[in-house]
């Protein structure tokens, strides 16, 4: 996995990103009740959706991911919705069904161990319940070019 802290182009750093792939439950939406959006998620997706594709994927399926985006009025910033379907021999989710160049995509997930090691994955702490003091998306915001102040 690439480091979330590398911002300069050069050997060993990630290429320009044109797609962001976010897990839904536990990453953007609380996983216990599904009723709260993680602090900063709206600002982050709004920012990313201006210049990049933003995809949501979920073990609950693409329709489920879409319904969560609509629930929180995020659907205007999202390009596509996909299921997390199938795993490889090592138990990691397959990404071949996603319309992304995995070398130019960033995956954001609270279960980074479920993704292949050759992907750029930004791990976030699990968002379990509504918490207005949560800072779980800060590293993602920094990678996306947002300051902490812009995230709130």
Please name every model-derived segment.
Residues 1-22:
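Non-catalytic pre-domain segments flanking phosphatase-related domains
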Residues 20-31:
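Metal-dependent nucleic-acid phosphoesterase active-site entry motif
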Residues 36, 63-64:
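Short alpha-helical
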């Amino acid at each position: 996995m690439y480091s979330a802290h590398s911002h300069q182009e050069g050997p060993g750093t990630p290429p320009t990103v044109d797609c962001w792939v976010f897990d839904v439950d536990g990453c953007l939406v609380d996983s216990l009740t599904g009723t709260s959006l993680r602090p900063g998620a709206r600002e982050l997706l709004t920012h990313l959706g201006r210049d990049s594709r933003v995809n949501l994927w979920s073990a609950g399926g693409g329709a489920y991911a879409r319904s969560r985006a609509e629930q929180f009025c995020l659907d205007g910033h999202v390009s596509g919705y996909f299921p997390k379907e199938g795993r490889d021999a090592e138990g990691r989710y397959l990404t071949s069904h996603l319309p992304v160049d995995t070398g130019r995509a960033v995956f954001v997930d609270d279960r980074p161990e479920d993704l292949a090691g050759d992907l750029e994955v930004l791990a976030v702490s699990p968002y379990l319940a509504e918490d207005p003091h949560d800072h779980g998306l800060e590293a993602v915001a920094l990678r996306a070019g947002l300051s902490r102040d812009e995230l709130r």
